[in-house]
Amino acid sequence: MIFAAGLGTRLKPLTDTLPKALVPVSGKPLMELTLEKLRKSGFDEAVVNVHHFADKIEEWLAGQEWISLQPGDGEGRMLVQVSDERDLLLETGGAVLHARKYLEGCGHFLIHNVDILSNCDLDWLMAQVRPDALATLLVSDRKSSRYLLFEPDTMRLVGWMNEKTGELRLAGPHVREEECLKLAFSGIHIMSDQVLDVMESYAKTRGLYITSDTPRFPVMDFYLSMCHLYNIYGVCSDDLRLVDVGKLDTLGIAEEFLKTL
């Protein structure tokens, strides 16, 4: 699943007229770069959530000969199905539940932010998933203002911290921040489809449904709230290089980065 519904406010004025997913880097939209990466790793199906300029994303998808928008429509093409959030942006956790009909029954599915470019070998990442993992998060030891905290022996998620504000969230009183590994999240993660039932229960018990069938919540809040009950692991890639194409001044950096892949 590709998270592509964001407003892209940090990329204004480009996103005044087009969605972040269609912002070009080296002549290709971010959406195309992400889908190409998935396809090269053997993924033949994807789900894309849309909100900001949703019509433009759908028009772009429909115009790609190598993409099919309906199951069974074109052998050898990549099936890309759209999860529609036009009415309301559901945040990342709500987006996953909203796309449930496309995701359940698949065993595991990968989540990839559309604005992340990386050298991550997705085949390698999928091979790191443990049988008992509800989710597996790609992380690395790099400078960031926000860190996920992991048990050093198990790499199980046990907390989060914001170094700028001093905010700290721990899985319980047994967790000691100073004993944890502090690693930065990459915006790429893998979920077991069992997460869908857990997410639904989480959203209902916390009153996160804004209508009878529409939940809205961030996926990281879900991870941090449930990591004391479920195995949510980090996978650290020592040679991971990535660019978050979230601001105008990162576009040039992203173009240079693509030349190194």
Question: Where do the protein language model's features map onto the residues?
Answer:
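A generic "binding-loop/recognition-motif" signal
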Residues: 7, 18, 53, 86, ...
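Glycine-rich N-terminal loop/short-helix segment of MobA-like nucleotidyltransferase
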Residues: 1-26, 37-41, 236
